[in-house]
Each structure stands twice: as C-alpha cells, then as structure tokens.
C-alpha cells in the first residue's frame, strides 16, 4: 500500500495530528467550539490589522486623520476597520465563553493548558488596550493616560516606570509610536503562545462534559468536529458582519469621534465593554494602590483556580450547588460590567463594592467550600 503523505510528510504530519486524525472525545458539545473560533478570530484580526497598518500613520498629528482617510478613501477601508474594531469584541466574547466552559467542566485541571490560556488572556488584554489608543480619539488618549498612570501606584519605582512607558512626561508622540509597535507585535506572540497552548492540550487530549476519562471512546476530529466548527464559524461571522455593516459604532465610545485633546477631559472615562468588569473592581477601592492590586488580582486569580478545586468530581455536570454558584458568578460579572460603565456616584459605588467583594468571595472561599461540602454529601 502506498504511504499516505498526510501521515509521513514531516510538516503535514503535525497538521494531520492536530486537525485531522486528532482523537477527540465523542461527546464534546458546542461549548468546545470556542477554541477554534478564537483561532479564526486571531487570523481575522491579524489580516484586517495588517491591511489597516498599511494605511495608518503612528503620529499624533496624523493618526486620527489617517483612520478617517482609511474609512473614506481606501477601497473597502470602512469595512476592514469595522471588522477589526468589532472583531475585537467577538474575540473577547469567545475567550470569556471559552474560560467559562473551562471553569464549568473542570478543564483547569490540565494545569499547563490552563496556565498558558491565562497568559494568552493577559496578552490579548494588553493587545486590545494598546490597539484602542491608536485611533487617537478623546477616549483613546484619556484611556491610555488613566490606565498607564496606574503603574505610578507601584511603590518607589512607579513614577519612573510610567515616564519610561510614556517616553516623556505625558502620553504623547513617543507613546503612540511604541503602542503601534506593540500592537503590531503582540498578535504574533499570541499566535506563538497558542501553539504552546495546543501542544499542552494535545498531550492530555480534550476534556468532556462528563469530566471522565474518554480514551475508550474517541473519534477523529475530521470530519466530525471540523464540520461542527464550520457551523460555529458561520454562526459567529453572521452577527459580526451584521454589526460591521449596520451598526459598526454600537460598541464604541462617541468620545472617540473627537480628536485627542490633552486640555479637555471627557466627563466619564471608561474602557471598552470587555474591560468594564475589571474597571469596576479597580474603582471599587478608594485607594490607588489597593485598586491596582484588586485589578491585577481580578484576572490573576485565574492562576489559582486549579488549586481551589476541592471536589472529587471534575465537572460541574452533576454538582447542582456548584452550578448555582457558577451562575451567581456569571451574574456578578454582568453586574460588574454594568457598574463599570456608570458614573462614580450613589448607588453605583456601593453596588460596585458589593459585587467586587462577592467576586473574590465566590472564587476564593465559596467554590472550595461548596466543593468539599458536596464531597461530604455524596460520598
């Protein structure tokens, strides 16, 4: 029999083992689609970003005009820009759902895969932040000023660190230039870490909704899940295209239609919707350093999740108490997202503080406690 090139060629063999003959659990649900959706998001963002970079000028006097020029005068420039801006939102929707899936079904017990995933989330957040600054609108400028200024809360080296990051004494031309360089570089770093993420995943194989070992019942990735993924791509691209064509500025901030002006502060400085939960946690503490620590902890807490798993069952499928707690956490995050978009006044302050406290309470104390309690009830 002639050797199959797909299985013998050094490069094709890697692709074959990752995307074609990959043994996959037979019972994984649509929640397992989000990994491939994130891959498609990354490819789309890199391609649209590359096309935008060809028309963008990283200079404070030209950045805003160059974006306007791209939308007005470049063939389909408006579409590329709208896909890129809204593609970021879909990227975050997918990654949050992907993390939620991992949390619900106990996928975090594959520690290396989980930790590289958290590093990917942090890199994605950094990429989105520096990218938001590039159009050099009012919210771009003031968002950059407020968030980079947080580093000044670090004792002793803070102020030096901020001035070093700015390349001067305020957010100005050097800042914009380096942010553009970083925004160009980081997606390729994300692509590299993604390969590491997949390497670790393929060491152990995928988890499944039952949270049990599935070695006895595997099926090839192609055609079963490759087809299922194509359906996922379609279901994601349809809303993305609707958003890009019909209401491209729905998720943006109206302040960004005004060119950056260091002399005029917008009434409410707030980041894009996907950072609002963390922004609410930052604002809930009336001390600068405390707020920065809480902000960092709100994301870095994900590294602790594998160590807080006290249940004898991996998945939450058969753990109703943990399920209730999980959906309480989801509701809590939605409340934080809403609070982050509101002005700092009564009653939003106290709601934000309560929701921030509850967020850490659920993750650090209630989840391990309920896990141990369920063990007592079940075994």
From Swiss-Prot:
A GO cellular-component term linked to this record: mitochondrial inner membrane
Segments crossing the lipid bilayer: 34-54, 78-99, 114-134, 179-199, 227-247, 289-309, 321-341, 348-368
Major location (coarse): mitochondrion
Protein residues bound to a ubiquinone: 202
GO annotation (BP), single: mitochondrial electron transport, ubiquinol to cytochrome c
Protein keywords: Electron transport, Heme, Iron, Membrane, Metal-binding, Mitochondrion, Mitochondrion inner membrane, Respiratory chain, Transmembrane, Transmembrane helix, Transport, Ubiquinone
Stored InterPro entries: Cyt_b/b6_C (IPR005798), Cyt_b/b6_C_sf (IPR036150), Cyt_b/b6_N (IPR005797), Cytb/b6-like_sf (IPR027387), Cytochrome_b (IPR030689), Cytochrome_b_C_euk/bac (IPR048260), Cytochrome_b_N_euk/bac (IPR048259), Di-haem_cyt_TM (IPR016174)
An example molecular function term from Gene Ontology annotations: ubiquinol-cytochrome-c reductase activity
UniProt function note: Component of the ubiquinol-cytochrome c reductase complex (complex III or cytochrome b-c1 complex) that is part of the mitochondrial respiratory chain. The b-c1 complex mediates electron transfer from ubiquinol to cytochrome c. Contributes to the generation of a proton gradient across the mitochondrial membrane that is then used for ATP synthesis.
Record note on quaternary structure: The cytochrome bc1 complex contains 11 subunits: 3 respiratory subunits (MT-CYB, CYC1 and UQCRFS1), 2 core proteins (UQCRC1 and UQCRC2) and 6 low-molecular weight proteins (UQCRH/QCR6, UQCRB/QCR7, UQCRQ/QCR8, UQCR10/QCR9, UQCR11/QCR10 and a cleavage product of UQCRFS1). This cytochrome bc1 complex then forms a dimer.
PANTHER family: CYTOCHROME B
Name used for this protein in its record: Cytochrome b
Gene: MT-CYB
